[in-house]
Amino acid sequence: MKNVANLEGEVYKTTNRIIQRQRMKDELNILFPEVAKQYETDLDNHIIYTHDEASTPVLKQYCMAVSLYPLLTEGVGNIDGVTPSEPNDLQSFSGQITNLIFLLSSQCKGAVAVGEYFIALNYYVVKEFGDKWYEKLDCEASSPHCLIKRTVRDNILKAFKQFVWGVNQPAGNRSYQSPFTNISYYDHTYFTSLFGEFCYPDGSKPEWIAIDTLQRMFMKWFNQIRLKQVLTFPVETFAMVHNGDDIIDLNYKQLCAEMYAEGHSFFTYISDSADSLASCCRLRNELAENTFSPTSGLTGVMTGSCNVITLNINRIVQDWALTHTLNGTPLIKGKKLIDNPLRVTVIENDLKNYVTRILERVYKYHIAFKTMLYDLEDKGMFAASNGGYIHISKLYSTIGINGLNEAARFLGMKVSNNPEYIEFLQLILGTIKEQNKLHSIHDRKRPFLFNSEVVPAEGLGGKNYKWDKEDGYVVPEDENLYNSYFYNAHDNTSILDKFILHGHQTYQYTDGGSAAHINLEDHLSKEQYLKLIDFAIANGTNYFTFNIPNSKCEDCGKIIKRPIDTCPCCGSHNITQYTRVIGYLRPTKAFGSDRQQEARNRIYSDGKSQV
């Protein structure tokens, strides 16, 4: 929705970028003077891209998954300086957690994940309706003097509404965008691992049956409410643990497939142990420790990214290729290779060394940025740190990846489930993961930890394509932007091949997550989703979601959770399609022109015939 609030956010972008770059160059001149000038050169040459560089003139972390324990003990008063106390009932909790998300989102550029939402919510449900409240869901819980009679269930649903309507409100401090909000569901195995030692401020512990009831209630309710209003947030992640053969908590496996079949949309994260956690739509946190601290409430859910710098792999690979000859003849810039004549996986050390030299500079850029964040934190400038919700030390510095498919196609490879392409993915992803570990600094006071992700690139995918084409590099003629998947979104790659491409062969080389987005033309049956969960376990596909476009009739307001041309209620053709680039649901007409063109070319698979 265009208005003066988001126009205001656009006006100062050029100024913001100038300020941010100068600040970085000043810090690099102090810490790493040998790369201070190179930073701007790398940006101007589109070798790298610093995300949200122009969104704000001040330093902010990128995204965060926070602990809610300080909210339970102190409330948001330790941030806003206004709220007099911690929440004392269900209604005040719902109000304060919404306020918290807005307060935290004002101090970061991206998402805020509240992985403990249902754990915290249960604390106040118990306070209000007593132990074993889940046995009293249909009992009336309102005074005889109340005109509106509400049951325990009604009061919980009211709390859901307050939270969801709240986080979908536009925020003035974010150019009239809603705060990007994430929540998580945990199966019994995950719950036991993450929260087995967790204690509420009053010394009590959360019961699994209570958390299970809240999670199921919310999923069912949220799925139904999206038939009345297309809601973007919260983005949901459904976490389960498997034993190598099957999901251990079979009840949650059934629930997962059931909710997909009923048309709900969420991410699924499966792991062979509860030692990692997908907190945002892309971030995977390998839990170094998972012990409960009664002073901080730490349960292993605190993580995030302080900065994202993305490598343009297509340009990097082409620059590398131009340093070689083919049969004694220099390569010509802008000419695509046929059948991988450079045999890139045979001379892999050469490309690996080339990428590593770039990475060594990028790590210095990241250290400079995070050092400035540490300095601001020491001065008390981050309310999230002051309040104990997240600390800069918990945040990763992220190496983003874009243009992988396009680089492979330049080299003459076919982007599909074939050994040559998979080896190329392993080479690039593996090099970055290896260097991330080698360059991470595990300092107790000021650690510098690195991870990687295949970035969503909602805007960057089109920018990199445009910049590379203008500068004479090879770009695919059947695309208009760079992909964010390990397959081509515009071809008919089978569903199973998509799972395989995002499976163990590649996933073991990523340390920040890369969700497989399976674009389908319609919803599958529960039995088919169960088969795909089994297939994901067998192939090590840890992180996936299913994307079926939604449709809304602009004349009568009817919402259908599949693509349609004609409204079944009023016959209107005035239909708005909603889909996901990566992560969150948006109307296609709100995309940039390049994304709208890509959306028209994207293939949505006939899953019913493939599974």
Model-derived features with residue positions:
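Mature N-terminal, pre-catalytic/accessory segment of carbohydrate-active enzymes
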Residues: 1-2, 7, 15, 583, ...
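Conserved catalytic cores of very large enzyme subunits
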Residues: 2-393, 414, 418, 422-568, ...
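Core of folded catalytic or high-affinity ligand/protein-binding domains
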Residues: 392-393, 397-400, 595-596
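Contiguous, well-ordered alpha-helical segments that form the cores/surfaces of helical PPI scaffolds
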Residues: 397-410, 430, 580
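Glycine-centered flexibility sites
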Residues: 400-403, 512, 583, 594
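Glycine-rich phosphate/pyrophosphate-binding loops
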Residues: 411-420, 589-597
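Long, charge-rich boundary regions
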Residues: 561, 569-611
